[in-house]
Amino acid sequence: PSATPPAPPPAPLAGRATTQLVFSVTLPPLSVSTFFVRSLSENEVAQTTALAEAAEETGASESDTNDGRAVSVSLDPNDGSLLVDFVVDATFNLTAKITAAFYASHDGSDGFVPSGAYVFRPDSSQKATPLGTPSFDPAASRVFRSGVLAETRVAFGDWASVAVRTWSKERVPHAEVEWTVGPIPVEADGVGKEVIVRYSTGLATGGTWATDSNGRDMQPRRRDHRDDWTFRNASEEPVSSNYYPFGSIATLTGDERAGFHLLTDRSQGVGSIRDGELEAMVHRRNLNDDWLGVGEPMNETQCGCRECDCPGLVARGTHLIAATTPATGPRTYRELQTRSQNPTQLAFAKVNGWEESIRGGSRRAVSVFASGAAPRNVHVVSIDRLPGEDCARGGACARIVLAHLFESEGCVGYDEELSAPAEVNLADFFPGRSIVAVEELTLSGTPIRPGDAVVTLEPMQIRAAKVEFA
């Protein structure tokens, strides 16, 4: 089945799509799959239920939910915020409230550095300002349902929106949060703005959370604390001093009932300013230079000018959110991480005679791997075909890089089952080829020692090898 919900706001830009096409497929690992898309005639639309448009409802109420097996979405009737309910286990459900807000950028009038390209420094005399109208406007919400997905969308004023999607037949229960922000208005008040999406869960986290380090080890964080020096900055900079970079994963820890996990499709700043909350900065527009060398404010516009009336940039991105028991958290966020950080690569071409192509079998997926080549705790970082001069025996050769996804016992990312050492047979990645030699490499490609076709990876280990074929 497929669906064609309208594209999300804000106001249309030149050349911007007005409709989305969504459909559900199964893609084998490292494979090439071909799909044919065409417009149906009115008669075909009437006869074809598989390509029916998603139903749309306006002014969703408290009873409007997107039903997934373990995830449902509704709207708070009091303020219109999005509520995502997760079934953690038989005894506990966790509800995450999604809101959007902005911090006013500090202008540096106190003699210290202003907020800018290299510095996040909000005006600490003000709390984050919620986006949207003071009273909930039901017309600002939309609900779409189809056999493929259920989507609830809320507009926060006229320059920000959030859509939450749940997909049918999902192996790892989670919700997809698509945020769209911009153009950020600064003309009326002359104040720069730092826009966040906030997730409030009610978990008793005791000021603790964790973020990834370059997508690998999870680093414990504690509010208003540093392990190796006395922290004295909490009262002056309570927000920015508790922000950390995360390129992939942030997770709330400390509550024995559940963990809440946030995954991003790009590097962002994240903080847990209050217990049970995570907030990610998604967009910024500053009006002051931060005195750190650029010599201009981070005031990006659609025209590329800064001293002009052109509107600011529109940014769009995706978060994945999930809630689990503490024990199953690492396996959930590591699997979602591989999806978020390694999206499917898309290519498009105009096709003539598509019916003949379908009958000829060109829809069939072509996969490089043998079934089950990579264990669940191993990620294939890359496979590269090497030039002939790098192949000592004059034949074909390739470089493969493998990474263990889980951490050792005692670490945040430890999983009782999947943190065990993983054994991989390189021959499974090259079905139909005969391996004659294996050489272990550094990650930069320098030879280390002769290797073996069977490779063992310890927790968090990354290994590279050159494989030569007969």
Give residue spans per PLM region.
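C-terminal (or distal) subdomains of carbohydrate-active enzymes
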Residues: 1-470
